[in-house]
Amino acid sequence: MAKNRRDRNSWGGFSEKTYEWSSEEEEPVKKAGPVQVLIVKDDHSFELDETALNRILLSEAVRDKEVVAVSVAGAFRKGKSFLMDFMLRYMYNQESVDWVGDYNEPLTGFSWRGGSERETTGIQIWSEIFLINKPDGKKVAVLLMDTQGTFDSQSTLRDSATVFALSTMISSIQVYNLSQNVQEDDLQHLQLFTEYGRLAMEETFLKPFQSLIFLVRDWSFPYEFSYGADGGAKFLEKRLKVSGNQHEELQNVRKHIHSCFTNISCFLLPHPGLKVATNPNFDGKLKEIDDEFIKNLKILIPWLLSPESLDIKEINGNKITCRGLVEYFKAYIKIYQGEELPHPKSMLQATAEANNLAAVATAKDTYNKKMEEICGGDKPFLAPNDLQTKHLQLKEESVKLFRGVKKMGGEEFSRRYLQQLESEIDELYIQYIKHNDSKNIFHAARTPATLFVVIFITYVIAGVTGFIGLDIIASLCNMIMGLTLITLCTWAYIRYSGEYRELGAVIDQVAAALWDQGSTNEALYKLYSAAATHRHLYHQAFPTPKSESTEQSEKKKM
């Protein structure tokens, strides 16, 4: 059930409001205001308020309308919420020429204040979705979204990256709010955050994000580039230009930004004045703001939000409705709640890791080269004790080399990389032991020698037991001798042809058990284990005839 009522809005004008009553609860919809939909918890995990999100985006009036999502993101305490409230004034008073309101009226809407501490946390959206007619007659839903500032004293880099990336993924117009200039670190942070967002999205040949607007606040060089969009376009063209004389790192940052966004633009906005910056009781009254700022603000907001400027949200080329945006919101937050994505790292941490990994690689390479000189491919067999002595000596030298390299991060940070180096060197040593053993002629002849001994022993036992009348034992020994002879021939064929290498490894394992242990029980146990592990190889080498397998299955049934 719907009722119309004429109300005074927050900006002094009258507007027709339609209040909806559900069939269950005859209560009017609450007054519009900011609603936090993404909550950053104390343990730096993220929670989506699905109830609030559904209530706003799935209302009957907007859920099937194509959506335009406008977001403002950037460093904390740079006036993002202050700007969002002027956007609200425009959206509520679009038809009025003097939409900025009365000069004595305080600025309300999204929570904001002066000072050095953060105000907004997580992501907030305005609870009222604005229905706007575009020039082609299509009615779209406009969603305004305010975000937590990056790099405040209570947020990790992952917090900042997640909030920025998520707002960029959800929005169709992302305003990157910057102070005074576009510096190289601003571009590098943008590269990091957008890449963090792109990782969470499905791969596509299209650019993953839509419109990016660099909003440079407190611009102090209008004599170089004038205030507004034209000056901003010339300024941004110079800042994002890729030239051959640039360092590769600088080129990659600019190429990455161009590859992520369909449209990139810039607006240069003057400083709002000293009263705004220094007055602790400033409440947003226009009379305290410089005229130059207000003049350009009146250009900026319509430039962003006029019907012809609105970009409908698209994902993979498909236009998204409010209903669809809810599903994408849920899907994206699940990715950031999990551990699938790598955690972004600070420049110090990333540099320290690279520094330590480079030291590990250098030390390991030194060990490798010296071990190759001692027992490499063309070197003769080395006694195992001598090889172990050399290994321990070179390992100590490699560890000393690692410790001698100047590394970032400190001793505690480097300790796990030292453990990694020692572990990798031990693994290399095992490979060198195997390689060295393969050069030992006695080691190479171990398997055939063992099999010959088994054949000889079973031959003698068969002869003796046959002579004294123990025919059963003699027959058993003859059978073992025959199987061993077949095994020897099979092993020789494998060595010659290179086929059935896994079966050859089984034969070597059994021979090694007989050679090293000298225990029949141990040998039989290894034979059983090897046979169980490589059963498929036995069937491949000695296939059972079809008729025989059928008879066996019938006997089992009997």
UniProtKB/Swiss-Prot annotation:
Modification sites for Phosphoserine: S10, S22, S23
Show the coiled coil region(s): 412-439
Q: What is the effect of changing S10E?
A: Decreased GTPase-dependent fusogenic activity. Specifically alters the membrane tethering step
Upon changing H247R, the result is: Impairs homodimerization and GTPase activity
The record lists the effect of I507D as: Loss of GTPase-dependent fusogenic activity
Keyword Cytoplasm attached: no
Q: Can you give the residue ranges of the GB1/RHD3-type G domain?
A: 64-309
What subunit structure does UniProt give? Monomeric and homodimeric. The homodimer, transiently formed by two molecules on opposing membranes, is the active form mediating ER membrane fusion. Interacts with REEP1, REEP5, RTN3 and RTN4 (via the transmembrane region); these proteins are involved in endoplasmic reticulum tubular network organization. Interacts with ZFYVE27; both proteins are involved in endoplasmic reticulum tubular network organization. Interacts with ARL6IP1; both proteins are involved in endoplasmic reticulum tubular network organization.
- Protein name listed in UniProt: Atlastin-1
